[in-house]
């Protein structure tokens, strides 16, 4: 078997908002775990809430890390978090750095999401609209977790939204600043408390006319619409997270021609991308291995 990405420590893929490990044959990290396994990596997908705040999800993740260490005898783990999964991973690394070898943020809103800001403004706190929307999205999150075989996971969509706004993440960053850049658009420290920090992300590039077959992807089209909600990082975002907002630790690249869902390999059949998202994970696993992680 190919052992080119047989990292020293296991890799945990941490999903984001409305995420899951798998529903039937459909994986959140589509084709990524399988590809890493085939290249010799030991990969796990933890079971955490589809919608909740960063700390609640992080506490769930930490418990599973302890269980995994007992099961496989690993001293530490490598965390790769997509979207809110990056904040979940950062929280665990901040409170238990001795258990974490590395944190990698993939399209993570490490300085908040302007889309979350707009959604937050659309609902007046305590009013009926907010209550109804929160109830519906929480129920949807519970439905997703039930479909994935985990119906008892706690869900709170309003807490999740508040945790992803610019203000919410700013408060989070004051408590857990590890790996953050000291200037907007810069890189953060590559290592803090013996934890290595990395990030990569993409942006939606070009006009609709230039995208040809990508216009067949309805999710990509929706993310293109969401781009109009951004003011600080207009045309420098992936539809959900701004380019510079994603920066953490060693920034591998933050302008891949990929939208927010492309980075977990969710593309409509027939659409085309110049970058293979799965290869980014394989390359990164090689990077972790070369770093002794």
From Swiss-Prot:
Biological process terms in GO annotation: lipid catabolic process
Gene3D superfamilies, alphabetized: alpha/beta hydrolase
Subcellular location: Secreted
Enzyme class label: hydrolase
Effect of residue 141 to G: Increases the activity toward trilaurin (C12). The lipase is destabilized at 27 degrees Celsius
Reported temperature dependence: Optimum temperature is 29 degrees Celsius. Stable at 10 degrees Celsius, but above this temperature the activity decreases. The enzyme is completely inactivated at 40 degrees Celsius.
Any Pfam family matching the protein: Abhydrolase_1
Keyword entries, A-Z: Calcium, Hydrolase, Lipid degradation, Lipid metabolism, Metal-binding, Secreted
Residues annotated for Ca(2+) binding in this entry: 217, 262, 266, 269
Protein name from the UniProt record: Triacylglycerol lipase
Native source species: Pseudomonas fragi
Organism taxonomic ancestry: Bacteria, Pseudomonadati, Pseudomonadota, Gammaproteobacteria, Pseudomonadales
Gene of this entry: lips
